[in-house]
Swiss-Prot record:
<dbReference type="Pfam" id="PF14893">
    <property type="entry name" value="PNMA"/>
</dbReference>
<feature type="compositionally biased region" description="Gly residues">
    <location>
        <begin position="174"/>
        <end position="211"/>
    </location>
</feature>
<feature type="compositionally biased region" description="Acidic residues">
    <location>
        <begin position="462"/>
        <end position="473"/>
    </location>
</feature>
<feature type="compositionally biased region" description="Gly residues">
    <location>
        <begin position="147"/>
        <end position="159"/>
    </location>
</feature>
<dbReference type="InterPro" id="IPR026523">
    <property type="entry name" value="PNMA"/>
</dbReference>
<dbReference type="Pfam" id="PF20846">
    <property type="entry name" value="PNMA_N"/>
</dbReference>
<feature type="compositionally biased region" description="Low complexity">
    <location>
        <begin position="449"/>
        <end position="461"/>
    </location>
</feature>
<feature type="compositionally biased region" description="Low complexity">
    <location>
        <begin position="112"/>
        <end position="129"/>
    </location>
</feature>
<dbReference type="InterPro" id="IPR048271">
    <property type="entry name" value="PNMA_N"/>
</dbReference>
<feature type="region of interest" description="Disordered">
    <location>
        <begin position="441"/>
        <end position="578"/>
    </location>
</feature>
<protein>
    <recommendedName>
        <fullName>Paraneoplastic antigen Ma6F</fullName>
    </recommendedName>
</protein>
<feature type="region of interest" description="Disordered">
    <location>
        <begin position="106"/>
        <end position="221"/>
    </location>
</feature>
<feature type="compositionally biased region" description="Low complexity">
    <location>
        <begin position="160"/>
        <end position="173"/>
    </location>
</feature>
<dbReference type="InterPro" id="IPR048270">
    <property type="entry name" value="PNMA_C"/>
</dbReference>
<feature type="compositionally biased region" description="Acidic residues">
    <location>
        <begin position="556"/>
        <end position="566"/>
    </location>
</feature>
Length: 578
């Protein structure tokens, strides 16, 4: 059970423990506290899985340790809720698997064979000893006979000479015969000894062979039965854990149809394909048929029709091959011509900012470059052309971009974005500065009592309309100059002087706006005099300088003429300077 769980989870069984008999109503914090108290001495660990086993009527948990386990420290039980929880480690699991194996008669058979071999060896030894004893007895008998013959020879020597010669010959013959008999006996004894030794060795070899054969038969039988038990356990737990693994690994794939509808919020095919590849990795334990079924459940529309047609032609078509076919269909739909047309027809939306439009245009440009519809060397030129023709840049930015286009130095993507940011910031600061100048208008001095009485009312009106204030101020100044100026030729100088100061023409007058626009364009970002604060300072100086400097000489001359006309009426007027 432990090995099967570890094989399914892909962990090392030697560094894992299996905890059984965990109550179903045991809370997570109670389980963690009990496991921590019992397993913390073994080292760092993590709980891989904790599931309810219907056949056990309780939960089971698989725990993996970071390092090898010390078998002497592994607890057999864990004190927890509902009673002790059983702990199973790898050696205990192997013992539990083999403890129910019945004892076979192979070992007694081996002992009987060994016992028979021992008896045969003992009999061989006894036979060899008996044969050796017989040989010794024969040898002693031969010696006795030889002694007797020798004695007879001695008697013959003591007798007559003839008899002595005959007896000597007989003694010699007897000695020779005795010697021959003794030699034969010795040879027989040696042969007996060798035979005994051979029988003993044969019996010993037979006994050893019997013992080895018995042990081999017993080991083979034990391995066969043990393998059968392990295989039975493996199949049982595989059938039990298969639904669990399917439940853990099965996660629905996001839907994909391949439709292109304006209101459709479906994700792109590239992102869906990456997610599908990851899901196939999680479905590795499922069968190929189940993987195809799950893939078909996530498809709809054109994508479903394509995969269904492929499976009708080849029922053994794998899920990976289905993804490959979908990639060939949906990735190749944007040809180089389609990508180029999408880029060339991209237009700035009504509520879309210029910065956002340029970013969206860049995405289409990069796709066109990938498809080969646009050469990379022409990317900056085409980007600038599309911004000028399909976007709505400000006049200052448009002049700057057109000058870059004529000079054949189009900006790249990042430089164009910086230029747009700088232009937007400059336009905002210019608008704030112009609004501040219109509110802080300089007061106008006037000798007309009616104009002086009307000045508070004009001030209130100027607060309501800053443009009307400038127009009223210019009109009052023109009236005063026309009243005090000489009748001959001086009326033409006053408007000219006012126009030179920039106060004689109102902002709403014809010709005023182009002059202001021209100055703004010259000082735009990227222009010849790019200083955003320059126009603000010039405008402030024009607003702060009172329009009375050009009128002072005219007023003084008119006052002198009035005094001379009153004091010297009838006298000719002397030329000035005398």
């Amino acid at each position: 059970m432990l090995q099967d769980w570890c094989r399914r989870m892909g962990v090392n069984a030697e560094r894992s423990l299996l905890i059984l008999d965990i109550p179903d109503d045991c809370e997570e914090h109670e389980f963690q506290e009990a496991v921590r108290a019992a397993l913390s001495p073994l080292g760092r660990y993590r709980v891989l899985i904790k599931v309810f086993r219907k056949e056990l009527g309780a939960r089971a948990a698989l725990v993996e340790f970071a390092e090898g386990l010390n078998q002497s420290l592994i607890p057999r039980q864990i004190a927890g809720k509902g009673g002790p929880w059983k702990v199973i480690s790898l050696p205990q699991a192997l013992d539990a698997e083999f403890q129910d194996i019945p004892s076979f008669p192979a070992q007694p058979q081996g002992q009987a064979v060994a016992r028979g071999a021992g008896e045969a060896g003992a009999a061989g030894e006894a036979g060899s000893v008996g044969e050796a004893g017989g040989v010794n007895e024969e040898r002693s008998a031969g010696e006795d006979e030889a002694g007797g013959i020798g004695e007879a020879g001695g008697v013959g020597e003591a007798g007559a000479a003839g008899e002595a010669g005959a007896a000597g010959e007989a003694g010699a013959a007897g000695e020779a015969g005795g010697a021959g008999e003794a030699g034969g006996a010795g040879e027989a004894g040696g042969a007996g000894e060798e035979g005994g030794t051979g029988e003993e060795g044969g019996a010993g070899e037979a006994g050893g062979a019997g013992e080895e054969g018995g042990e081999d038969e017993a080991g083979a039988a034990g391995e066969a039965v043990g393998a059968g038990v392990v295989e039975a356990w493996t199949q049982s737990w595989r059938q039990t854990l298969r639904p669990l693994v399917k439940t853990m690994a099965y996660r629905e794939l996001r839907p994909f149809s391949g439709r292109e509808q304006p209101g459709c919020v479906e994700e792109s095919f590239e992102s869906w394909l990456e997610d599908a590849k990851d899901m196939l990795q999680l479905w590795c334990h499922a069968s190929e048929r189940e993987r195809r079924r799950r893939l078909l459940d996530s498809l709809d529309g054109l994508a479903l029709d394509i995969v269904s047609g492929l499976l009708e032609e080849d029922p053994d078509f794998s899920a990976q091959d289905c993804l490959t076919a979908l990639g060939q269909v949906f990735r190749s739909r944007d040809t180089w011509m389609t990508s180029r047309m999408k880029f060339l027809t991209c237009t700035q939306g009504p509520q879309e900012g210029l910065f956002a439009f340029v970013v969206r245009l860049e995405g289409l440009l990069q796709k066109a470059v990938e498809k080969g519809a646009v050469h990379p060397a022409m990317a900056n030129h085409l980007r600038l052309r599309q911004v000028l023709s399909r976007a709505r840049p400000s006049e200052a930015l448009q002049d700057t971009l057109r000058r870059m286009q004529l000079e054949r130095r189009p900006p790249d993507f990042l430089r164009l974005l910086r230029l747009i940011r700088d232009m937007e910031a400059w336009a905002a600061s210019l608008a704030r500065s112009q609004q501040g100048v219109a509110w802080a208008a300089a007061p106008v001095e006037s000798e007309d009592p009616a104009a002086a009485q009307a000045s508070p009312a004009q001030g209130d009106a100027s607060e309501a309309d800053p443009g009307a204030e400038d127009a009223d101020e210019a009109a009052s100044t023109t009236k005063e100059a026309a009243r005090v100026a000489p009748a001959t030729g001086e009326d033409e100088n006053a408007p000219a002087g006012l126009e030179g100061l920039g106060q004689g023409r109102s902002p709403d007058a014809p010709g005023g706006l182009p002059a202001r626009m021209g100055s703004a364009v010259d000082m735009a970002p990227g222009g010849p005099s790019w200083e955003p604060e320059g126009l603000v300072q010039v405008g402030g100086q024009e607003a702060e300088e009172p329009p009375q400097e050009g009128l002072k000489p005219i007023l003084e001359e008119s006052e002198n003429e009035d005094e001379d006309g009153a004091g010297e009426a009838g006298k000719p007027k002397s030329p000035p300077g005398k």
